[in-house]
Amino acid sequence: MGYPTGRRRVSIFVDGANMFYTQKKGLGWFFDPAKLLRVLREDDQLTDAYWYMGLKQPPDPRDENFVRFLAYAGYVVRTKGLKTIYDSETGETTQKANLDVEIVMDMFNTVNNYDKAILLSGDGDFERALELLRSRGKELCVVSTQNWIAAELRMAVGSHFLDLQELRDKIERTDRGPAPEKPVTESPGVGQ
């Protein structure tokens, strides 16, 4: 398909919670969100990049710094307060902020702004949304890891799957942990 500018218009949608656990448990290393954005938009015209994440209430200062870092790097950050979920069988509680609906809403509300959607998630709940986007003529790519992607999501995109392991040398963080250690003003920008 030829594009008027010679480059595809691309929007990126990052399921932050899914990517956190993919990195922590699936990869054993963390990527730098600014480096990731540079790599994913390399040959294309970036129209939007969204990062979705749950926040403790009140927000933890590290989370607030990470949100500022993401915005500085070029992401539109969508947040939702974490909810406590009680499991009556085990008596355990977990905290969760499900942003799947927000991701799909943004995918469809901005559908005329991009030619290609890149989803960073391994969550099979996105299978139907991707099928509908494909029926509207959109190119799709899912970024995750082989071991942390639902089979139905992997099958929905076929060869349009990118394994984070293949990008490690370009996107791996060189500092510790998933949140920036330095103030936002010292974090590298997307264009640097």
Where in the sequence are the language-model features?
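Terminal and domain-boundary accessory regions
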Residues: 1-192
